[in-house]
């Protein structure tokens, strides 16, 4: 250790934080509760970042202009940008790479396509997809909720939104999952992925995306997201081609794994909570709130979202230097007892309006309505079709740089007499 590093260690409060240790993904809450009770902020040496643990401090950062979303503001941005160069344009021109003025411009173009009314037009297609997946497995005694079900839903919904043929779904699904993982390379300290495999899926997906956009330029459609974005690009130069590719790529990447894990975690928590499940069965209108409670109680993120200091600043008593990374430990913030009563209880009737699961401020997730609709239909339908479904075994978790990755969730199906 150099003298400079030693001096830094003396001024940065360090705590034992091992989000990639065995068993963490299965149940991170005892570890993060100890951290939250001990300190509002600490320095994570392995992750080269600060970590915020408490709700109010995390919530405030979402609207604090001293913190940037763009990785370009990170002191290690050059190193990050060079990791998996095939994604360099997505990192630079995607919503999380744009400066505030460009971010606002792009979000203004995108937001109309993600309103609740616009997304509700996809309800029939999502229901059809869900029914087809369950019909194909209805004769089975066992069922993997992740591989046999959840993985088949989000890309079909996104393809319907973008009016992309179903034959593209699997390639785009691989692209979405690979991109979400690849964006963690260089951002978090451990990546077990075979980089060549990630690059192959990313390259395949980008080529397909360019082809889809070229075809839509030649044959524009009415009431179509891609046509609207392309015409905005052509009419006013408001979207560059790189921005357009990065934006659509981000829609695919952000909407794939997140929705898969939301469905899986929702099924898991409802099966583990018979009283909650009976409430949701008796009152289907509770399902949307139950999904929000899943994300509060058992959040799918391994660590959380990141911000980067735009200037030297003091926060929670810590001296944060310009360019340093700050992780917002979302699963910890959402178990903060100063905000949520009985925070360690799964309560599907809870008021979840204070949840930070989808972010806050100008960077709130634009795909919230779509993810909620997919999960609402997927989870509601599977319990309606198989009301006596039971867990067969504990879920199998794998590695993912961003998510608590449930790889397999095996259940025993007991279909109702009505089918």
From Swiss-Prot:
Stored PANTHER family: CYTOCHROME P450 YJIB-RELATED, P450, PUTATIVE (EUROFUNG)-RELATED
Coiled coil location: none
Organism listed in the record: Sorangium cellulosum (Polyangium cellulosum)
Cofactor: heme
Lineage of source species: Bacteria, Pseudomonadati, Myxococcota, Polyangia, Polyangiales
Pathway: Secondary metabolite biosynthesis; epothilone biosynthesis
Reactions performed catalytically: epothilone C + 2 reduced [2Fe-2S]-[ferredoxin] + O2 + 2 H(+) = epothilone A + 2 oxidized [2Fe-2S]-[ferredoxin] + H2O; epothilone D + 2 reduced [2Fe-2S]-[ferredoxin] + O2 + 2 H(+) = epothilone B + 2 oxidized [2Fe-2S]-[ferredoxin] + H2O
UniProt-recorded Gene Ontology molecular function terms: heme binding; iron ion binding; monooxygenase activity; oxidoreductase activity, acting on paired donors, with incorporation or reduction of molecular oxygen
Superkingdom of the organism of origin: Bacteria
Database matches in Pfam families: p450
Keyword Membrane: no
Name under which the protein is recorded: Epothilone C/D epoxidase
Keyword Heme on entry: yes
Function summary: Involved in the biosynthesis of epothilones, macrolactones which have a narrow anti-fungal spectrum and microtubule-stabilizing activity. Catalyzes the epoxidation of epothilones C and D to epothilones A and B, respectively.
A Gene Ontology biological process term: epothilone biosynthetic process
E.C. no: 1.14.15.-
Assigned keywords, A-Z: Heme, Iron, Metal-binding, Monooxygenase, Oxidoreductase
Protein family: Belongs to the cytochrome P450 family.
């Amino acid at each position: 250790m150099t003298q400079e590093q030693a001096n830094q260690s003396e001024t940065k409060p360090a705590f034992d934080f091992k989000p990639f240790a065995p068993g963490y993904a299965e149940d991170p809450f005892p570890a993060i509760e100890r951290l939250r009770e001990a300190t509002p902020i600490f320095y994570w040496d392995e992750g080269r970042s600060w970590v915020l643990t408490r709700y109010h401090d995390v919530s405030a950062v979402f609207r604090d202009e001293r913190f940037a979303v763009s990785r370009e503001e990170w002191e290690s941005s050059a190193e990050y940008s060079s990791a998996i160069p095939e994604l360099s344009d997505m990192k630079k021109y995607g919503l999380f790479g744009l400066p505030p003025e460009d971010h606002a411009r792009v979000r203004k173009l995108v937001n109309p396509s993600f309103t609740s009314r616009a997304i509700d037009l996809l309800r029939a297609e999502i229901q059809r997809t869900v029914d087809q997946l369950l019909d194909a497995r209805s004769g089975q005694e066992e069922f993997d909720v992740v591989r046999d079900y959840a993985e088949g839903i989000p890309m079909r919904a996104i393809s319907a939104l973008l009016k992309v043929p179903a034959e593209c779904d699997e390639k785009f699904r691989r692209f979405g999952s690979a991109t979400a993982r690849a964006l963690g390379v260089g951002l978090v300290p451990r990546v077990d992925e075979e980089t060549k495999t990630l690059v192959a899926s990313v390259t395949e997906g980008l080529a397909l995306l360019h082809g889809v956009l070229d075809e839509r330029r030649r044959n524009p459609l009415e009431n179509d997201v891609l046509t609207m974005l392309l015409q905005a690009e052509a009419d006013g130069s408001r979207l560059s081609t790189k921005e357009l590719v990065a934006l659509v790529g981000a829609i695919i990447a952000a909407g794939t794994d997140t929705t898969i894990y939301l469905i899986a975690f929702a099924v898991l928590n409802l099966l583990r909570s018979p009283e909650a499940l009976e409430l949701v069965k008796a009152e289907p209108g509770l399902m949307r709130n139950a999904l929000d409670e899943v994300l509060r109680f058992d959040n799918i993120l391994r660590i959380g979202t990141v911000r980067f200091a735009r200037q030297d600043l003091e926060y929670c008593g810590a001296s944060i230097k310009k360019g340093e990374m700050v992780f917002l430990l979302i699963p910890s913030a959402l178990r903060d007892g100063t905000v949520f009563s009985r925070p360690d209880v799964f309560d599907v009737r809870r008021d979840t309006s204070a949840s930070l699961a989808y972010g806050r401020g100008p960077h709130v997730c634009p795909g919230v309505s779509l993810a909620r609709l997919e999960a609402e239909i997927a989870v509601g339908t599977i319990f309606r079709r198989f009301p006596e479904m039971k867990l067969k075994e504990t879920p199998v978790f794998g590695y993912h740089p961003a998510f608590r990755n449930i790889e397999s969730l095996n259940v025993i199906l007991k279909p109702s007499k009505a089918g």
